[in-house]
A protein has these predicted regions:
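Short, intrinsically disordered, charge-balanced linker/junction segments flanking boundaries
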Residues: 181-188
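Thiamine diphosphate
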Residues: 1-178
């Protein structure tokens, strides 16, 4: 999922000069190709997530599409007030990406768990939440995630997730619509 995200991000950035990427001092292995190709559109905010989100809002209000990238709960719960006050209330074009949703970074302790992130962001006005199940769904949601105006949140796995969908079956994905895994009547 993470590699699919970065590939789609790079493709989008080539066609949209307004796109910038902000990270919280991590992800360099997977983000290196973006950093190399777009050095003027990459910012490392350091380990200061709240300032990172405020910076993203400022860039967005100046006309940029800003992607904020971090792990676990750091781009969400750590800076929920900044997302609410600086991004959501101003309908800033900020795209928040969490890598390692749920307990993926569990061995690092509960400070790295991202279990309440989706429900917290769903409470904020106008925030769209995307939670793809696999790389195929990640690719399908990247277009709407990046191109639709306003605040959006993308929650993806760290890598190695099983592929549940055929990418062709997801062509024409529409934001806000469910993607069925299978049809059947066994449940009723």
């Amino acid at each position: 999922m993470r590699n699919t995200f970065t590939r789609c991000l790079e493709d989008y950035a080539r066609a949209h000069e307004e796109l910038v990427l902000v990270t919280g001092d991590l992800g360099f292995g997977v983000l290196f190709p973006y950093m190399k190709e777009f050095p003027d559109r990459f910012f490392n905010a350091g380990i200061s997530e709240q300032a990172m989100m405020s910076m993203a809002a400022g860039l967005a209000l100046e006309g940029h599409t800003v992607v904020v990238y971090s792990i676990g709960n750091f781009p969400t719960l750590r800076c929920l007030e900044q997302i609410r006050n600086c991004c959501a209330y101003h309908d800033a074009n900020v795209k928040i990406v969490c890598v390692g949703a749920g307990f993926v970074y569990g061995v690092l302790g509960m400070t790295h768990h991202a279990t309440e992130d989706m429900s917290a962001l769903r409470l904020l006005p106008g925030v769209k939440v995307y939670a793809p199940a696999d790389a195929a769904e990640t690719e399908a949601v990247m277009g709407p995630f990046l191109s639709e105006p306003g605040v959006a949140y993308l929650r993806i796995g760290r890598g190695g997730e099983a592929c549940l969908h055929d990418a062709q079956a997801l062509k024409g994905y529409e934001s806000g619509k469910a993607v069925p895994y299978a049809d059947g009547t066994d449940a009723y």
